[in-house]
UniProtKB/Swiss-Prot annotation:
Name under which the protein is recorded: Ribonuclease HII
Low complexity bias spans: 1-36
Positions of region (Disordered): 1-40, 265-284
Lineage of origin: Bacteria, Pseudomonadati, Pseudomonadota, Alphaproteobacteria, Hyphomicrobiales
GO cellular component: cytoplasm; ribonuclease H2 complex
RNase H type-2 domain: residues covered: 71-259
Organism (species): Rhodopseudomonas palustris (strain HaA2)
C-alpha cells in the first residue's frame, strides 16, 4: 500500500492580528472568489435545458441544381431494412418545383394519418415509382445489396430518367445518372422525404396484405419488426415464406423445426400486377 506522506502544514502559533484594511481586503477577495465560483458552477444564461428545433426538409438543393440546368432531380429512399419479414420497398420521387407538398418530413417523424395524406398528395403532383426486393432476394444477396438493388430499380422506373438523384444513406447507386448519397437525407431534402413517405406507406399496405396470406403473425400490427408479439408468434408458428431466413431470430426459429417452407406464394410480386420474381418495379 502506498500512503501519502505529505502532512498538512501546521498553523502558526499565536493569534494573528488583523487590521481593518486587511479585513476589508479579505472580505472583498472572498466575495470575488465566491462570485467566480458561482459563475463557474452555474451554466451560462440561455445554455440550460431547452428544445432543439429541427428544420423540416427543404427543396433548396433541388432548386440549386435546377438553376444550373440539371433536371429532372429525384430523391429516393427505402423502407423495411430492419424487419424480420416482408420485402424492402424503395421509392423514387421527382417533385414538381411549383407544387412541393407542405409538411414533408422523414416518414418516421410523421403519424400514420399524416403519411397517408401526404402519400396521396405526392402521387397526385409528382413522378413516383417503387421497387420491391423480396425476402427471397434478401436471403440470397443480403439486406444491403437487396436494398441498393431496389433503390436503383426505382430510379430507373421513373417516367423520365433523372439527371441527378439524391439517395438517403451512405451509398451511391449504380444508376444511369449522377447519384449523390446524403446521410440523414430524409430529414434534409424534400425529394428524399417524399420518397421515404411513399416507401413507408407502400410497405405498410403490403404488410397488411401479407397478414391475410399468413394469419397469426400480426404483420398488420408490427409490419414485420421484431417486437415481442412477433417473436412469440415466430416461436409458436415457425417462420413463414415471408420471413428473412438469415436474420438472427428467424434463423434461431429455423433451428427448432424440421423441413422448409414452400416457395413464396407470389403475393409480394403481384402487388402491382407484375409477374412474381425476386423483385420488381412499378410507376405509381
Amino acid at each position: 500500500m502506498i500512503r501519502n506522506s505529505t502532512k498538512p502544514a501546521k498553523a502558526a502559533p499565536g493569534k494573528a492580528k488583523t487590521t481593518p484594511k486587511a479585513a476589508k481586503s479579505a472580505a472583498t477577495s472572498s466575495k470575488a472568489t465566491g462570485t467566480a465560483q458561482a459563475v463557474k458552477a452555474s451554466p451560462a444564461k440561455g445554455l440550460g435545458k431547452g428544445v432543439i428545433a429541427v428544420a423540416p426538409p427543404s427543396f433548396r438543393r433541388e432548386r440549386a441544381l435546377i438553376k444550373r440546368g440539371i433536371w429532372p432531380v429525384a430523391g429516393c429512399d427505402e423502407a423495411g431494412r430492419g424487419p424480420l419479414a416482408g420485402p424492402v420497398v424503395a421509392a423514387a420521387v421527382v417533385l414538381d418545383p411549383k407544387r412541393v407538398p407542405k409538411g414533408l418530413d422523414d416518414s418516421k417523424r410523421l403519424s400514420a394519418e399524416k403519411r397517408e395524406e401526404l402519400f396521396e398528395e405526392i402521387c397526385a403532383s409528382a413522378q413516383v415509382s417503387v421497387a420491391c426486393a423480396s425476402p427471397e432476394r434478401i436471403n440470397r444477396d443480403n439486406i444491403l445489396r437487396a436494398s441498393l438493388w431496389a433503390l436503383t430499380r426505382a430510379v430507373h422506373a421513373l417516367p423520365d430518367l433523372p439527371q441527378h438523384v439524391f439517395v438517403d444513406g451512405r451509398d451511391r447507386l449504380a444508376t444511369r445518372c449522377e447519384s449523390e448519397a446524403v446521410i440523414g437525407g430524409d430529414g434534409l431534402i424534400a425529394s428524399i422525404a417524399a420518397a421515404s413517405i411513399i416507401a413507408k406507406v407502400t410497405r405498410d399496405r403490403l404488410m397488411c396484405r401479407l397478414a391475410q396470406d399468413c394469419p397469426g403473425y400480426g404483420f398488420e400490427q408490427h409490419k414485420g419488426y421484431g417486437v415481442p408479439e412477433h417473436l412469440a408468434a415466430l416461436a409458436r408458428l415457425g417462420p413463414s415464406v415471408h420471413h428473412r431466413r438469415f436474420f438472427a431470430p428467424v434463423a434461431a426459429a429455423w433451428q427448432k423445426i424440421e423441413g422448409a417452407p414452400a416457395e413464396p406464394t407470389g403475393l409480394t410480386g403481384d402487388l402491382f400486377g407484375t409477374p412474381a420474381d425476386s423483385g420488381h418495379a412499378a410507376t405509381l
